[in-house]
């Protein structure tokens, strides 16, 4: 029986980081058993402004903000089309690619989390994005998700020259074992090289001998 196809949520904002993200997804995931959902949260006002707590109506009256909104919508529409064509070039079919543009509800990060609860196998996004309004940095959604998303694997993508070469920091914990499992599930193919890296801290034996309080009770010296 054929394995069930995995559904991957790819959060994009149309920036250069998102372009690198699409290339990474195309080169890393198998088009045979993966469905891709291109997901964008549309905000009326840049996230940086929303974080200031200043009234939204004030910014909507600004010509530069209205221009940003129109430009942002056009950019996302064009990017979605280009992203779909790019993924087709990697072997994905039109039926395996879904494009979703939704209005911001609870915040970009929280909206992504809520979407990820709908049967996804993983979430992929870039490290940060940049708006075109006075070169303001929108703020890293990835950093907000790292501490909040525990139910599915979160893959944060930067600029990668070799997405088929993977380094796993392995400490023998249950979480590390889960990471290995997910890498095996997603990054299939004979051309994928995985390195398990475990760093051992050196033990200062001299310090242990000189400071008996650092020794376990059974190893403490006994006075005659």
Predicted segments, located by residue:
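Structural beta-alpha unit
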Residues: 1-3, 46, 67-123
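Small/aliphatic-rich secondary-structure junction motif
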Residues: 2-65, 165-223
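Gly/Ser-rich helix-loop-strand patches that form or flank binding pockets
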Residues: 3-7, 17-18, 22-31, 109-165
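A generic structural signal for alpha->beta connector loops
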Residues: 33, 94-96, 151, 191
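A structural preference for short, hydrophobic beta-strand core positions in alpha/beta folds
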Residues: 38, 96-101, 156, 196
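Short, flexible loop segments at the rims of nucleotide/cofactor-binding pockets, characterized by
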Residues: 99-104, 133-134, 146, 172
């Amino acid at each position: 029986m054929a394995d069930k196809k995995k559904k991957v949520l790819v959060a994009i904002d149309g920036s250069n980081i998102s372009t690198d993200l699409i290339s990474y997804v195309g080169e890393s995931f198998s088009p045979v058993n993966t469905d891709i959902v291109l997901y964008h949260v549309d905000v009326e006002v840049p996230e940086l402004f929303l974080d200031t707590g200043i009234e939204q109506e004030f910014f909507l009256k600004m010509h530069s903000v209205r221009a940003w909104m129109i430009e942002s919508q056009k950019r996302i529409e064009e990017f979605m089309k280009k992203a779909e064509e790019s993924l087709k070039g990697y072997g994905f079919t039109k039926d395996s690619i879904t494009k979703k543009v939704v209005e911001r509800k609870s915040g970009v990060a929280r909206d992504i989390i809520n979407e990820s609860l709908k049967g996804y196998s993983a979430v992929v996004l870039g490290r940060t994005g940049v708006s075109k309004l006075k070169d303001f940095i929108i703020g890293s959604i990835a950093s907000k998700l790292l501490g909040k998303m525990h139910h599915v694997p979160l893959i944060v993508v930067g600029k990668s020259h070799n997405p088929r070469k993977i380094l796993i920091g392995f400490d023998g914990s249950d979480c590390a074992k889960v990471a290995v499992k997910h890498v095996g599930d997603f990054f299939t193919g004979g051309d994928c090289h995985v390195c398990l890296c475990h760093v051992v801290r050196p033990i200062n034996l001299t310090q242990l001998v000189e400071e008996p309080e650092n020794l376990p009770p059974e190893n403490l010296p006994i006075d005659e």
